[in-house]
Amino acid sequence: MIIKPKIRGFICTTTHPVGCEQNVREQIAFTKSKGAIENGPKKVLVIGASSGYGLSSRIAAAFGSGAATIGVFFEKPGTDKKTGTAGWYNSAAFDKVAKEEGLYAKSINGDAFSNEARATVIDLIKQDLGQIDMVVYSLASPVRKMPETGEVVRSVLKPIGQPYRSTAIDTNKDVIIEAEIEPATEEEVAATTTVMGGQDWELWMSALQEAGVLAEGTRTVAYSYIGSDITWPIYWHGALGKAKEDLDRASAAIDSQLAKIGGGANVAVLKSVVTQASSAIPVMPLYLAMVFKVMREKGIHEGCMDQIYRMFAERLYNNHNPAELTDDKNRLRLDDWELREDVQQACRELWPKVNDANLFAETDYQLYKDEFLKLFGFGVDGVDYDAEANPEADFEVITL
């Protein structure tokens, strides 16, 4: 079929398999161009492995460190009538290139919050790898089905305390609007922490450790975002921020458990990038359009792959000066360039000046739009979008 983008709100309902594969190949080529990661991991589990930072982590481990990887994700395959999710095509492409290069790669498609997923992963590790030495936790799901009760808990993107009013972009019409969001209730904050906090990460690490599949010196990392005062009301000081604080709590608990086997846990605080998750957050598209422009002008702009390679090579597996690599909460800070005062001050000055007439000129909004479409495999260089594409992509995957 000939596949074109169809956008509804902050989701593109179609995806392009060839474009997704090309995206993955570009990330792999970038990783290889940077060279091997010194002292990198060799057997890696990535929970949430099909897009964004999770996919980049799997690529960094496999193609930067020669690691065997197991990826867990929840995606829909394409059929002869309908395209699958981008994450399905990303994972199919990863599997294809990994196999071409003789790397071990196995994938599990199912609910990563479930006990079944944990049991399946543990069996697979025992059968194929014996033990693993790194666990990346990169889930960004709006809902969580509780493994014991089956209750479905939903997260919210809301402020705490008072309504949040701010300039934002209506990304369907490309115009500036005033967004207003009512504050979260106590129940909504608690639910958001249940879904987006550190509890599930702890369940995974406990299950893996109890099963004896974690090697001596195992490292684990989960991803967070703090941002600046521009986005704090909706993010760090909002319901999502409470969930991310819970991630810090979990990190400390897991770290003390892993210390028994000479390992450790960290939260990695990453920069803002265009992902399906970030496009759903009011204010983020406008902030991203601004911060991209400022960081590009200063020569410090990074995408998912750049960030994750830097995290592996310069933070997580940099054994030269470990004390300097974390902040006072033992977090790996990869948002250091974004949060530089000169970058944030430029964004603050730009914020009140942006209007409908100058949106494209004063910010990198076009880059934001391009990056958003690329998430779904569209607008990728070297892909013929007028050609027929096969929406069915099969690869070695265990479906739960």
UniProtKB/Swiss-Prot annotation:
GO BP annotations listed: fatty acid biosynthetic process
GO molecular function, one term: trans-2-enoyl-CoA reductase (NADH) activity
Binding site for substrate: 225
Record's catalysed reaction(s): a 2,3-saturated acyl-[ACP] + NAD(+) = a (2E)-enoyl-[ACP] + NADH + H(+)
Protein's pathway: Lipid metabolism; fatty acid biosynthesis
EC nos: 1.3.1.9
Pfam families, alphabetized: Eno-Rase_FAD_bd, Eno-Rase_NADH_b, Enoyl_reductase
Residues the UniProt record annotates as site (Plays an important role in discriminating NADH against NADPH): 75
Classification via PANTHER family: ENOYL-[ACYL-CARRIER-PROTEIN] REDUCTASE [NADH] (PTHR37480:SF1)
HAMAP family listed in its UniProt record: FabV_reductase
Protein name as it appears in the record: Enoyl-[acyl-carrier-protein] reductase [NADH]
Organism: Marinomonas sp. (strain MWYL1)
Lineage of origin: Bacteria, Pseudomonadati, Pseudomonadota, Gammaproteobacteria, Oceanospirillales
Record gene name: fabV
